[in-house]
Amino acid sequence: MQIINWASLLLVTWETVVAAELPIVDLGYQRHQAIGFNSTGRYYQFSNVRYAEPPLGPLRFSLPVSPRNRSHEVVNGKGLGNICPQSQACWFNVQGDFVSAVTAGSTFNFTAAYDQVYQQDECTKPRPVADQNPLESEDCLFLDVYVPEKVISKRRDGNGKSNPGAPVLVYFQDGAYVSGSKSDQNPSGLIATSREDGSTGIIYVGVNYRLGVFGWLSGQKFQSEGGLPNAGLYDERLALEWVQRHITKFGGDPSRVTVMGVSAGGGSITMQLTAYGRAIRPPFAQIIAQSPAWEPGTKTPAIEDDLLDSFLTLLNVSSLEEARRLPSQALLDANYELVASRPYGSGVFGPAIDGSFVPDSPKRLLLERKVDPSVRILTSYTANEGFMLAPANVTDDATFNRYVDVLLRGANASVRAHTSRVLYPPIFNGSWPYHSQHERANLLWSEVSTTCNTRYLHQAVATPGYAIEYAVKPAMHLSDTSSVFYNGQGSSSSLNATIAQLMQRQIVQFVKTGNPNVKGDPHVPLYHGQAHVLSLGDNGVRVEPALTNTDRCTYWQQVEF
């Protein structure tokens, strides 16, 4: 086995290569040249490859359209690098202070933290221009392709015939459907791990998709005015179809595509699996769904219409058609302000039932197995998913019940009462898996929004899959991302280099073979029957029962809300 020199990956070394020597790929609509060669990782990077027309003007809030213009000009993506417009709910700032205090063993004054963020009314004011990332642009539907040197060189043999292609890993980023970009993660560690066995390695594709109001507005009123719900899902789908059409030109195998994502990225992958209720075969063979997140109880018709009305009010217009004609900066500002001002503890955007791409609740589609049964699945979740997302002000029954009302806004009074009294009762004597009101809210968010979703995925497909639990403390939502993309850097308490390298080997092995098990490493069990997972923690690696093997998960999949 080839040994990775992780210290060398600390330095991002881009070798100076004469432009004429960098590979060029003819995509039909443009000729795209690699922007550089990483001499440490031995891979080429093709940056900012356009996969859709700019979603501006009449294409705002509409289907993404494949590039129309044909050009023989060679481009390399330099000077583009746009990211989709970003935003974040202000209450996340309070939660960040809470997490920092608790993990440091300090006391946390919620009122003081809340007042500091909210009392000065910063969350309802327009964002200062200086705070905006200059790369933010509606023209953001680009992707990056990272290709190992040997994959490029072996695209064709000496007789001009195509060689068997390399496996492909497509990544959708996290960000609560309102932030993030294809550039958030550095895949150099994964690529290096994929070459440990002496093979050519894997191709990595990072994708931008529309966020916030640009990608996730929905509802009857929005549709009646010509808006397309779930535009972000259609962006992702077009990118996956782009991979199917073009990845052979980079040396990849379109029949060996794995889609990976965490949080919103994992939730998006779930929607891609259930898309159209199995009416159309998915453009991928495997998924790696990490903490697949969506909040099914937060999308009611009234909430959807209220979001649209609030957005139009911020723009000082009365219709979506008028919004389409406004300058881009006006929409960027309104998007930011709308998300920032959302009520404490509430989600804002995400997938919605639209009768087409999302024909029904994904949990119900999975229950009815309306998916391609041949798709192979690897899932993961963290042991403490809801720690940073359950509101810090849940300290008694009254605040817990208010949180239930926020999280399950689409549920009726009976479901909410059952949640508080039966599913998550205020019992803290050790007989339930929580010892405080915040831990109670933590478990509620975890099961409703992420962990139970992994169980639904496994039960929907024909072939038993695999599951991993990330238990390195604090093991909260997203804390495993630094391990997945470990490249020799990082010294935080949430990163264990041994665990990180193990996770990377498991991921790469799954991408290559559909099985995450590597000879000599701890065995990842099949997820079936009693549902066991491989738990990766500070105190060792062991097989344990899945946190999802509960009656509560069964209830959440079957109840209407």
UniProtKB/Swiss-Prot annotation:
InterPro entries to which the protein is assigned, alphabetical: AB_hydrolase_fold (IPR029058), CarbesteraseB (IPR002018), Carboxylesterase_B_AS (IPR019826), Carboxylesterase_B_CS (IPR019819), Type-B_Carboxylest/Lipase (IPR050309)
Enzyme class (EC, first level): hydrolase
Chief place of localization: cytoplasm
Amino acids binding substrate: 263
Biotechnology (record note): Patulin was originally used as an antibiotic and specifically trialed to be used against the common cold, but it is no longer used for that purpose since it has been shown to induce immunological, neurological and gastrointestinal effects. Genotoxic effects of patulin with dose-dependent increase in DNA strand breaks in brain, liver and kidneys have been detected in mice. However, more recently, it has been proposed that patulin might also have anti-tumor properties.
Residues at the active site: 263 (acyl-ester intermediate), 385 (charge relay system)
Similarity remark: Belongs to the type-B carboxylesterase/lipase family.
Protein known as: Carboxylesterase patB
Upper classification of the organism: Eukaryota, Fungi, Dikarya, Ascomycota, Pezizomycotina
